[in-house]
């Protein structure tokens, strides 16, 4: 699933090419890709002839403000892509929604797994009411509101593993498997350590590392594991510099120990047994 750096990369790419241009037409090829309105034709009619004024990101959600005050919201989920095409091309097998712009340009929503969703929300609609998951998101981790005190308070009574806690969007908005593994490695924390056992010093270090890793991910254009690419069709490059994620069986870049992988709450976790000793997770 695209995480904060990937979604931010998409947002920045869309701002470069779609702003102030009227949407001349919309085509919905898979009805269930449209969450609201319930009828795809209504989705089409509300967006036709509108222009995008601004793109924002909230966690893993993309939000476009249109020139009439309405909103287009998109969640890429597991495999969604938003691709910008400057010349007409027939839709590929997994194309779900197409937005057409002047000069024959097209914004295309491609989604192999079909979990991605699009919403059109009228100007008087509260976004968090229409999409309840947005109401529970933590502050943006690269904003001033995401403080050490906030993170400490959320972890203080959390009995889950620290890896599982970091994936909770009410604790770190936009965090996913890749950057959680990277953050725990740089913090020296074993993924199975109970979140509530972290010391104030560990929480402070983890907070700083989360911000660092997410910024580095954005600077690298995100991570391409299977399907992610920017609107311009460019792959993300963070994977080539990853400390542990996706590197099972390879040598740790710090100490040379073999990177291991375990299953935790149904998710894979990559870690270095030497740099993230299991002893730090025992007896706490």
Curated annotation (Swiss-Prot):
Cofactor note: Binds 1 zinc ion per subunit.
Gene from which this protein is expressed: mutM
Entry superkingdom: Bacteria
Binding, DNA: 94, 113
Keywords: DNA damage, DNA repair, DNA-binding, Glycosidase, Hydrolase, Lyase, Metal-binding, Multifunctional enzyme, Zinc, Zinc-finger
EC code(s) of this entry: 3.2.2.23, 4.2.99.18
Catalytic site: 2 (schiff-base intermediate with dna), 3 (proton donor), 60 (proton donor), 267 (proton donor)
GO MF terms, alphabetically ordered: 8-oxo-7,8-dihydroguanine DNA N-glycosylase activity; class I DNA-(apurinic or apyrimidinic site) endonuclease activity; damaged DNA binding; zinc ion binding
SUPFAM superfamilies: Glucocorticoid receptor-like (DNA-binding domain), N-terminal domain of MutM-like DNA repair proteins, S13-like H2TH domain
Cofactor: Zn(2+)
Zinc finger (FPG-type): 243-277
NCBIfam families: fpg, PRK01103.1, PRK13945.1
One Pfam family this sequence matches: Fapy_DNA_glyco
Name the UniProt record assigns to this protein: Formamidopyrimidine-DNA glycosylase
GO terms, biological process: base-excision repair
Protein family (similarity comment): Belongs to the FPG family.
Function as written in the Swiss-Prot or TrEMBL entry: Involved in base excision repair of DNA damaged by oxidation or by mutagenic agents. Acts as a DNA glycosylase that recognizes and removes damaged bases. Has a preference for oxidized purines, such as 7,8-dihydro-8-oxoguanine (8-oxoG). Has AP (apurinic/apyrimidinic) lyase activity and introduces nicks in the DNA strand. Cleaves the DNA backbone by beta-delta elimination to generate a single-strand break at the site of the removed base with both 3'- and 5'-phosphates.
Catalytic activity: Hydrolysis of DNA containing ring-opened 7-methylguanine residues, releasing 2,6-diamino-4-hydroxy-5-(N-methyl)formamidopyrimidine; 2'-deoxyribonucleotide-(2'-deoxyribose 5'-phosphate)-2'-deoxyribonucleotide-DNA = a 3'-end 2'-deoxyribonucleotide-(2,3-dehydro-2,3-deoxyribose 5'-phosphate)-DNA + a 5'-end 5'-phospho-2'-deoxyribonucleoside-DNA + H(+)
Subunit (UniProt): Monomer.
């Amino acid at each position: 699933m695209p995480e904060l750096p990937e979604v931010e990369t998409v947002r920045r790419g869309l701002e470069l090419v779609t702003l102030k241009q009227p949407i001349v037409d919309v085509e919905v090829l898979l009805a269930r890709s449209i969450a609201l309105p319930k009828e795809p034709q209504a989705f089409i009619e509300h967006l036709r002839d509108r222009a995008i004024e601004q793109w924002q990101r909230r966690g893993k959600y993309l939000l476009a403000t249109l020139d009439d005050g309405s909103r287009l919201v998109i969640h890429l989920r597991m495999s969604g892509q938003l691709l910008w095409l400057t010349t007409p091309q027939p839709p590929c097998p997994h194309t779900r929604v197409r937005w057409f712009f002047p000069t024959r340009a097209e914004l295309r929503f491609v989604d192999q797994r079909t979990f991605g969703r699009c919403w059109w929300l009228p100007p008087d609609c509260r976004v968090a009411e229409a999409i309840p998951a947005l109401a529970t998101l933590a502050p943006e981790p690269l904003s001033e509101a995401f403080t050490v005190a906030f993170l400490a308070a959320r972890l203080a009574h959390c009995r889950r593993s620290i890896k599982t806690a970091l994936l909770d969007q009410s604790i770190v908005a936009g965090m996913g498997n890749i950057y959680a593994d990277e953050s725990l490695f740089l913090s020296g924390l074993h993924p199975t350590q109970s979140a509530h056992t972290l010391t104030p010093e560990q929480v402070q270090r983890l907070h700083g590392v989360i911000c660092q890793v997410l910024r580095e991910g954005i600077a690298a254009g995100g991570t391409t594991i299977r399907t992610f690419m920017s609107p311009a069709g460019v792959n993300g490059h963070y994977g080539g510099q990853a400390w542990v994620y996706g590197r099972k069986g390879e040598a740790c870049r710090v100490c040379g120990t073999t990177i291991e992988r375990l299953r935790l709450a149904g998710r894979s976790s990559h870690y270095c047994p030497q740099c993230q000793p299991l002893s730090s997770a025992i007896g706490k």
